[in-house]
Amino acid sequence: MSMNSFGHLFRVTTWGESHGPALGATVDGCPPNVAVSEEMLQHWLDKRRPGQNKNTTQRNEPDAVRILSGVFEGKSTGTPIQLMIENTDQRSRDYGEIAQTFRPGHADITYFQKYGNRDYRGGGRSSARETAARVAAGGVAREALKSLAPGIEIKGYMTRMGEMEIDRARFDWSAIDQNDFWIPDAAAVQDWEDYLQALRKQHDSVGAVVEVVARGVPAGIGAPIYGKLDTDLAAAMMSINAVKAVEIGEGMNAALLKGSENADEIFMGNDGAPVYSSNHAGGILGGISTGQDVVIRFAVKPTSSILTPRQSIRKDGTAAEVITKGRHDPCVGIRAVPVAEAMMAFVILDHILLHRGQIGENQGVIGAPD
């Protein structure tokens, strides 16, 4: 299997399977002398860790990360950083019945069609368990951003879960870390929990919309045409398990607007920097950052592993009824939030490194004489 790496100069390769002995990431291209510790990476992993509340999978993994290389005396050396997370709470017996059967909505059938072999235990490589490695590597990216571009803040949150949607009039950044759903609407939390638990009792699952914002991204990051910042951001988010659609800025809603409504007007601020009247562009124009918030959102499909009987086929082509056992998230969007933050950090850091390598400092100074 190839295509397990992401990035240009800051490059992350993940490895491992859901029920294997361990999984992890190799981070190549991290600048030297960046503060990196297991404790710091653990902080981000704990946001994603399973088994912490009744709204996520009950698989109870500590997700304890070990740094095997690339860090000396608390600082990156500039060489590859190897991260490892042991799997300790596998329950592979739950998957014995699907060894010969393809689960509807899963990658079981496509992996078999492509490779002729698959690890059916928990989905193997296609499991969302793989994203733990991304979150650990994302911690490295965040620390590098602190050194190279202090002031950048990355925050993800859910805006929708099935029929439930946040009220943006009540949007509160401080509420995001205070509830199990990572939503910026504290008044909606109980309704969301009641809705999800009702679905769980029905042996069903639900999809979600996750939004990620990067504040403080300097103008000029990205490149035209094939090197667009939004191209890599879209690819990063689409690579997350179960993601089926990505929007940047106004996204699909831009098709409903007139040009006079969608174009963000520009003024000169009192500090001599451009000020925009709105941010329909999501902080990116022509593939290059404007200096506004970079805003991206994506849709996550409902978890396919449910106890409701579904029709499928076996490897020999005969019909089968599938009831997926095991411990699964009723809404995978909840734990996708820290994964999305990690992917945003990867891309922003990667493009800052690319920008410095090609341009150095921004060349166009607005307000300067010709």
Swiss-Prot record:
GO terms for cellular component: cytosol. GO terms for molecular function: chorismate synthase activity; FMN binding. Reduced FMN (FMNH(2)). Keywords: Amino-acid biosynthesis, Aromatic amino acid biosynthesis, FAD, Flavoprotein, FMN, Lyase, NADP. NADP(+) binds at residue 48. PROSITE patterns: CHORISMATE_SYNTHASE_1, CHORISMATE_SYNTHASE_3. One of its GO terms (biological process) is chorismate biosynthetic process. Its EC number is 4.2.3.5. It comes from the Bacteria. Pathway: Metabolic intermediate biosynthesis; chorismate biosynthesis; chorismate from D-erythrose 4-phosphate and phosphoenolpyruvate: step 7/7. It holds the Pfam family Chorismate_synt. SUPFAM superfamilies: Chorismate synthase, AroC. It catalyses: 5-O-(1-carboxyvinyl)-3-phosphoshikimate = chorismate + phosphate. It is an enzyme of class 4 (lyase). Its cofactor is FMNH2. FMN binds at residues 125-127, 241-242, 286, 301-305, 327. This reaction introduces a second double bond into the aromatic ring system. NCBIfam families: aroC, PRK05382.1. Homotetramer. Belongs to the chorismate synthase family. This is Chorismate synthase. It comes from Ruegeria sp. (strain TM1040) (Silicibacter sp.).
